[in-house]
Amino acid sequence: MIHRLLPLLAAALVVPAAAGADPITNPVPTTVETHQGAAVTAQLIPATTPPQNPQMAPNPWSNIHNDSWMTDAYAYAGPLGKDLIAESHSMPPALCGSITFDSHGHIVSVCPSIVQGPQARVIDAKTLEVMATYNMPTAQDPPGTKMYQNFSGGGYFFLDGQDRIWSATKTSHLLVLQVAADGKSITEEADYDLTSVLEGDQRITSALPDFQGRIWFVSKKGGTVGILDPKSKKITSIKLNEEIENSFTVDRDAVFIVSDKRMYRFGVGKSGKPVVQWKKTYKNSGIVKPSQVNAGSGTTPTITNGGFISITDNADPMNVVVYRTARKLKKGQKRVVCEVPIFPAGKSATENSILAAKRSFFIENNYGYQDPFGPNSGAVTEAGFARVDINKKGTGCKKVWENMDVRAPSVVPKVSTATGLIYTYTREEAPMGDQPYFWTALSAKTGKTVWKIYAGSGLPFNNNYAGLALGPDGTAYLAVTGGMVTLKDG
């Protein structure tokens, strides 16, 4: 199966370098209805208000999850569904899964590929033409690495306030790349070697700055948690001997990391070394569920106002788990605020961050997704989207709604608190070989699907864990294996 799909994927990806105006080839037109629902009026919902990390680009444009609290939320409007314009744009081979925007409105991304090393790109947000590239160092992946579940080497990166890309490489370095004001060049500004604290088969999953300017980083294998001082180049680290396959979350005075076993709060010790300030084991079935990278939580932790942080565990059925972020609890408080089961047993898993809107969390079901090389790559996934709210006293939670109709295989969805809509990317049940993908909007208030519109069919329109993004003008963007798809109101 793998050998059969490799040429297919390569054919889907290989397009001319200057391909901004060309649509993605749609090899299997859909047989299902291409537009359902109708435009809605905006319904403002309460918003989480993450602080601005001074070391990162302005919220919500600094990383795949928008801000250092990883809320996946926008305070401005995305499409409402009026005269929707859905387009596709072919690009040079790579998947630009993390989309950020620089101070001049250009798309900035780091794009892993199966046919070349990761490539940093500047992309025109209007034409989707690639304006500049930088080929990043590459290295052979450790044995046993699943090609399309490997987020090292740029899958996670962040953009700072000076329009600089900070990205880990597959060679276990941290590169700092300057994007020119006109977007026409990318130049290397710094290169930090982190191999002194990493073993040969360890790769950096993610690197992020704390509010004081230190750069934290984590490795998947072995669970190394490290700190780099960019000024002195001093590196300190500890090893958890667990797996860390997600990115992490940064608050003003702490860093929150979830491993395949536990939820952690970290601080900085007197020696400058990472120190565990609290940790909590979560429920775990021990099963690597279909769509998951390992037998553990699939979420990057998400903080919301009031001192709460959420993940999903790996129980069956899966729970939304909410913790208190505080280092020390007040009298009568418990570390775990709630554990709320969502989606049916044997059919619940997520490999994406939870969305936050004040005291509401929104969670997507990815159970059953197989990467493009998987034996069931053409099959639809299990349905499910849910909302869980923290009560006003902060002492418990409840499930507000579940939508068991939408099937979102792997996208990082987003919520607009200005429209009250959740934006996701779904697959419809259709005849085998059809594989239609849709832009889909849900009501954050009720969970009902309000509209959806056809994006394209087949492998070129598979987003494979890429994150949806809303541009400054409200246009929705999503990387797919064939390039990028966009959606906006007419």
PLM region spans:
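Sequence/structural signature of beta-propeller modules
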Residues: 20-139, 162-164, 489-490
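Surface-exposed loop and turn segments in beta-propeller and other repeat-based domains
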Residues: 80-84, 133-148, 189-200, 275-294, ...
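Repeated scaffold domains used in trafficking and secretory/extracellular systems
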Residues: 91-100, 140-158, 196-208, 241-252, ...
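Conserved beta-propeller blade signature
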Residues: 106-110, 164-168, 214-218, 254-257, ...
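Loop/turn-rich, solvent-exposed surfaces of beta-rich toroidal or solenoidal domains
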Residues: 111, 308-312, 351-459
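Beta-propeller blade signature
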Residues: 124, 180, 228-229, 265-267, ...
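Asp-box/WD-like beta-propeller blade repeats and closely related beta-sheet repeat scaffolds
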Residues: 135-154, 158-159, 168-212, 219-223, ...
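Blade-level signature of beta-propeller repeat domains, shared across WD40, Kelch, NHL, RCC1
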Residues: 462-490
